[in-house]
């Protein structure tokens, strides 16, 4: 791979993780598939903070092309895969502590000043607050009636003007909590529905989607399937390949 191509892909990846992609997501995903192992892209961790729990990606399974994982008759839950910007929100003893962009899954940008206007300040059950640290993960989404809704949502997280962020038509939909509370993921989603919009309690047809997520419901089984460095094996995203997607980037010519 020549250096110009590597530099271009590095730029694409950096912009992708910042939520301001310079090429369509589907094209970026295909480029990554075709160049895996050819080069390593580093990320500047300055001004970024570590997630208490990694925010893994999902294995992509393309309909008609790939074979889905075999979960050995374990109960599996299907939910829509919303197309927005992934975030994490941390609560300490039930009180909002901070919020971050997904970033590269290990490190994200602090967006506490914005998310505190969307996420609840406390998570209490009666007079009891959750003890210890809980990391809630979810998606910031915008209505699909907005042009380039994903970029609209992701771009909002990079705004310096909090008042402008508050004026944007954005919704937080959550789909995860760590450490786990109950024995089943569906059980925890029902609990989180006391405070949040959760992925299991609506069809969310007003928001853009880019597939369907399937995951093993019982946490012990989910963990038994293990993880790769990229994704949990107990879940995957079923997607449809868009027509006209570029399948391989061969070279880059720079305008001079």
Language model segments and positions:
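RNA/tRNA-interacting regions in translation and RNA-turnover enzymes
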Residues: 1-256
């Amino acid at each position: 791979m020549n250096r110009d191509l590597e530099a271009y892909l590095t730029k694409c990846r950096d912009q992708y993780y910042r939520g301001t992609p310079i090429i369509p997501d589907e094209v970026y995903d295909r480029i990554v598939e075709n160049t895996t192992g050819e080069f390593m892209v580093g990320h500047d961790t300055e001004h970024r903070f570590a997630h208490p729990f990694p925010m893994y990606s999902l294995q992509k399974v393309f309909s008609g092309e790939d074979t889905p994982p075999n979960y050995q008759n374990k109960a599996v839950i299907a939910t829509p895969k919303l197309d927005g910007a992934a975030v994490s929100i941390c609560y300490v003893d039930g009180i909002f502590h901070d919020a971050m962009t997904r970033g590269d899954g290990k490190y994200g940008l602090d967006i506490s000043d914005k998310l505190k206007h969307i996420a609840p300040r406390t998570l209490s059950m009666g007079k009891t607050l959750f003890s210890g640290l809980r990391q809630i993960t979810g998606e910031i989404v915008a209505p699909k009636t907005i042009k380039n809704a994903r970029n609209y949502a992701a771009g909002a997280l990079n705004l310096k003007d909090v008042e402008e962020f508050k004026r944007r038509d954005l919704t937080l939909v959550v789909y995860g909590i760590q450490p786990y509370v109950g024995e089943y993921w569906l059980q925890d989603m029902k609990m989180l529905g006391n405070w949040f919009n959760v992925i299991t309690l609506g069809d969310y047809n007003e928001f853009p989607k880019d597939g369907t997520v399937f995951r093993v419901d019982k946490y012990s089984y989910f963990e038994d399937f293990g993880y790769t460095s990229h994704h949990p094996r107990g879940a995957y995203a079923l997607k449809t390949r868009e027509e006209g997607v570029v399948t391989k980037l061969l070279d880059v010519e720079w305008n001079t």
